[in-house]
Amino acid sequence: MNPNKKIITIGSISLGLVVFNVLLHIVSIIVTVLVLGKGEKNGSCNETVVREYNETVKVEKVIQWHNTSVIEHIPYWNGGTYMNNTEAICDVKGFAPFSKDNGIRIGSRGHVFVIREPFVSCSPKECRTFFLTQGSLLNDKHSNGTVKDRSPFRTLMSVEVGQSPNVYQARFEAVAWSATACHDGKKWMTIGVTGPDSKAVAVIHYGGVPTDVINSWAGDILRTQESSCTCIQGDCYWVMTDGPANRQAQYRIYKANQGRIIGQIDVSFNGGHIEECSCYPNDGKVECVCRDNWTGTNRPILVISPDLSYRVGYLCAGLPSDTPRGVDAQFTGSCTSPMGNQGYGVKGFGFRQGSDVWMGRTISRTSRSGFEILRIKNGWTQTSKEQVGRQVVVDNLNWSGYSGSFTLPVEMSGRDCLVPCFWVEMIRGKPEEKTIWTSSSSIVMCGVDYKVADWTWHDGAILPFDIDKM
């Protein structure tokens, strides 16, 4: 066979094979369509699975095509029910670590926000860490000058408890340089205070949507708790301050339902000072342990009833829990009046345990370093100095900061009482260290039925960062 005939023969065979292959594909497609058409009638290939959760229903649609599964998740809102939160606080013997975010250590090479004032609050399903960002990242030029409390760049954001405040997992909550947040069992309510010092505004969000506002009534830095607000049977309560930080100011209790204010009352507290209350539910009421930034080294307390009647005074215990403070031996407690003459202060907390109290404080009397929690026998009702429990959380060689309270709801814990928990902020950078920035991380502890050994769960970041050396 001559070369030309060979080429023609090979070409003809190749063309025939191509045509045969195309016909096979057409037959395969027809058979597949017929088979899948029959399968749809008995639902063997296409099926929809519905799984229900506490707060949402997740529809999982599975489409199978030639052994390939495509899963599509379609979340939609299920209202749920209000949390009761009328149970008593559990009596606990110690506090075990719940979470630690290590945000500053991670932030030396990760995309982590510069923050302050972190706090924790829980829904029936999850606990979240809320924090006030500075609109900047660690180890970045915009972190310069973030020691400043109030700026238009500050926002309230949140992550699941234990996560660092990073840009990939954080959820925006509100524009704010002061804030509080809590869950009523159905949706999150967040309150963010922002604006100029003389005309600040608190914007209430419910389920992520702005629902109400509070305008500054005294024209002097309207501010709120910097920790969890408290919801009982669908109504949520929080405390706000407007006025000077170093003399008499004005204080109000607010009550909201589904993010709309349904009640408020002025707190009469002449000669006393209330800021940054740490509140929790207990026996159907809201109990708050606050900060006196004027004179007292003992802490103000507020006990709020659902009808907004209240009792105000000071934590009776014969040991001071604010910073700075004098020596314990020279302190005499009072249930009604500020004691000591140390101005300034730091946000703190306490938990009533019958007539006893667990109260947190820095270990240092003069600076925000170290942290311990003490149980004082009869310290809620009497000027007792008797310590019946003590636990160190951060040693005095390391920085601490603000601290505050929250509870685990019975829907989460499975117990018939509310588990008391607290967080400790660990501030790094300015003004104590040679950096251009100020930020913090936190350790979170929850009450248990056993004593827990002392240790130091300090921040641990090695400073300065690269940005501080430029």
UniProtKB/Swiss-Prot annotation:
Positions of transmembrane segments: 15-35
Pfam families assigned to the protein according to its UniProt record, in alphabetical order: Neur (PF00064)
Regulation: Inhibited by the neuraminidase inhibitors zanamivir (Relenza) and oseltamivir (Tamiflu). These drugs interfere with the release of progeny virus from infected cells and are effective against all influenza strains. Resistance to neuraminidase inhibitors is quite rare.
Region of interest (Head of neuraminidase), residue spans: 89-470
EC number(s) stated in the UniProt entry for this protein: 3.2.1.18
GO biological process, one term: carbohydrate metabolic process
Residues exposed to the Virion surface side: 36-470
Binding site for Ca(2+): 292, 296, 322
Subcellular location as annotated: Virion membrane; Host apical cell membrane
KW Iron (keyword) present: no
UniProt-annotated glycosylation sites, renumbered to this chain: 42, 46, 54, 67, 84, 144, 293, 398
Segments of this protein annotated with the region Hypervariable stalk region: 32-86
Annotated S-S bridges: 90-417, 122-127, 182-229, 231-236, 277-290, 279-288, 316-335, 421-446
Intravirion side: 1-14
GO CC entries: host cell plasma membrane; membrane; virion membrane
GO MF term set: exo-alpha-sialidase activity; metal ion binding
Active site (catalytic residues): 149 (proton donor/acceptor), 402 (nucleophile)
Residues involved in substrate binding: 116, 150, 275-276, 291, 368
Membrane topology qualifier: Single-pass type II membrane protein
Reaction(s) this enzyme catalyzes, per UniProt: Hydrolysis of alpha-(2->3)-, alpha-(2->6)-, alpha-(2->8)- glycosidic linkages of terminal sialic acid residues in oligosaccharides, glycoproteins, glycolipids, colominic acid and synthetic substrates
Swiss-Prot/TrEMBL keywords: Calcium, Disulfide bond, Glycoprotein, Glycosidase, Host cell membrane, Host membrane, Hydrolase, Membrane, Metal-binding, Signal-anchor, Transmembrane, Transmembrane helix, Virion
Domain statement: Intact N-terminus is essential for virion morphogenesis. Possesses two apical sorting signals, one in the ectodomain, which is likely to be a glycan, and the other in the transmembrane domain. The transmembrane domain also plays a role in lipid raft association.
Oligomeric form and interacting partners: Homotetramer.
Additional free-text comment from the UniProt record: The influenza A genome consist of 8 RNA segments. Genetic variation of hemagglutinin and/or neuraminidase genes results in the emergence of new influenza strains. The mechanism of variation can be the result of point mutations or the result of genetic reassortment between segments of two different strains.
Record family assignment: Belongs to the glycosyl hydrolase 34 family.
Protein name (record): Neuraminidase
Gene from which this protein is expressed: NA
